[in-house]
Swiss-Prot record:
Residues 266-306, 337-361 are annotated as: Disordered. A motif (Nuclear localization signal) lies at residues 278-295. One of its GO terms (biological process) is gravitropism. This is Protein LAZY 1. It comes from Oryza sativa subsp. japonica. Belongs to the LAZY family. Expressed specifically in the cells at the inner side of the vascular bundles of young leaf sheaths and peripheral cylinders of vascular bundles in the unelongated stems. Expressed in the leaf sheath pulvinus and the lamina joint. A motif (IGT motif) lies at residues 69-75. The chain crosses the membrane at residues 63-83. InterPro entries: LAZY1. The keyword Transmembrane applies. PANTHER family: PROTEIN LAZY 1.
Length: 416
């Protein structure tokens, strides 16, 4: 409103048309007369008016021009705007004094002085007391205290009720509240195989009927597992579970390796001599010895030698790699079979394989490698060797074994 009054005041003091309407001398016909405004009416060029403040603006100056019926917006109106009379004409700025008070109950209330103006009710904002949050905090504190009390107990004094309480708290933490109650705790079922439960609870319940007999550690007089009251570590529990789950796979792998080794040893002994037969028999004997010690050592409860432990670790590592990288394992098996078959085909007849001087000579590749100790710098590196070689070695020299690139033509062929 103050800005609007200032704009109209400037408009009236600088425009001659409004001056003619206010004096009533010319009416509408004097709109085109260009009269020079005196210096005291021009606020832009008068030094006295610029030095002093402007006179106060009344409500009549804001809405009407001398009772002529003209609106202040600049358009011609039919009726003049009704102006309120009284002491409220000088000020139209309304200020509400708002008092913000805080209740004793923790609520926040907004009040104003003119609460009964127009029959309106003063809005009151009151925040409810934090009773629900306090109840939740109290419940959590009770649960934490109960779990701590159970954790301080010994393994012998732990009961099924304590285990159920801890299991319920774990379900809440892990987000199992929304799951149906059909899930049975391991303490009630007694057959769930989960090594993490045994590590968390540290009680004999985790070792009961969860593993085979040959994997269970002997108990002492107090009833705890592991001998001497030692708590079973998490790594041992996971290793026991892994042995129980992959026992069939380990036996199958061991039997497969024993069968292959036995066949290779027998074939080499019949063809090559005592050295090959000794190697195959030693390998088979070693595998069977490891297998027997693995089967009897766990049941007896005695310590296993370092070689058996290392062999078990290697087998577990192989199974892990087969599960993680199945395509690499399959490729390795195929390459091993191909190399085995190729070696049997090349060494099936000849003086090198059988030791018979009357038999045909070995392949040119073997003779070439025997004559030239440094591989890659003999007749094998010649590009024309494949053409002059016999038909039996054409596949090896052409596709499966490469040759050195000596000319640009060879490089161009390889690039294409």
């Amino acid at each position: 409103m103050k800005l609007l009054g200032w704009m109209h005041r400037k408009l009236r003091s600088n425009n001659d048309v409004f001056k003619e309407f206010n004096t009533g001398g010319g009416g509408a016909c004097n709109c085109i007369t260009g009269l020079a405004s005196p210096d005291h009416d021009n606020d832009y060029f008068s030094g006295d008016d610029a030095a002093h403040a402007s006179p106060p603006v009344t409500a009549g100056d804001l809405f009407t021009f001398g009772g002529s019926g003209l609106l202040t917006i600049g358009t011609l109106g039919i009726a003049a705007v009704a102006i309120p009379s009284g002491g409220d004409d000088d000020d139209y700025d309304i200020d509400f004094e708002v008092d913000a008070t805080s209740d004793d109950d923790g609520g926040f209330t907004v009040e104003d002085d003119d609460a009964d103006v127009g029959g309106a009710v003063t809005p009151t904002f009151t925040f409810p007391a934090a009773t629900a949050a306090e109840a939740v905090v109290a419940t959590v504190e009770k649960a934490v205290a109960a779990v701590e009390a159970i954790a301080e107990k010994d393994d012998d004094t732990t009961t099924e009720d304590d285990l159920m309480v801890v299991s319920a708290e774990l379900e809440k933490v892990l987000g199992g509240v929304d799951v149906a109650s059909a899930r049975v705790s391991f303490a009630m079922g007694g057959g769930v195989d989960c090594p993490l439960q045994g590590f968390l609870f540290g009680s004999p319940v985790s070792d009961v009927e969860s593993r085979p007999e040959y994997l269970q550690a002997p108990r002492d007089s107090s009833g705890s597992c592991g001998g001497g009251g030692r708590r079973t570590s998490l790594g041992e529990l996971f290793m026991r579970t892994r042995f129980a789950d992959e026992k069939v796979a380990l036996v199958a792998v061991a039997e497969g390796e024993d069968g292959v080794a036995g066949d290779d040893g027998a074939a080499a002994a019949g063809v090559g001599g005592d050295r090959a037969g000794k190697g195959g028999g030693y390998k088979t004997m070693k595998k069977r010895k490891v297998k027997d010690e693995k089967g009897g050592g766990g049941a007896a409860g005695g310590g296993m030698p370092a070689t058996v432990t290392k062999s078990k670790f290697q087998k577990i590592l192989q199974i892990f790699h087969r599960k993680v990288y199945p395509e690499n394992t399959l490729l390795t098996r195929n390459l091993t079979k191909k190399s085995r078959n190729r070696g049997a085909t090349d060494n099936g007849g000849g003086a090198v394989a059988t030791g018979d001087p009357d038999g045909p000579l070995a392949s040119p590749v073997l003779r070439c490698r025997k004559d030239h100790p440094m591989r890659g710098f003999g007749c094998c590196t010649n590009g024309a060797f494949g053409a002059s070689s016999p038909g039996g070695n054409a596949e090896m020299n052409g596709n499966k074994s490469g040759h050195w690139i000596k000319t640009d033509a060879d490089y161009l062929v390889l690039e294409l």
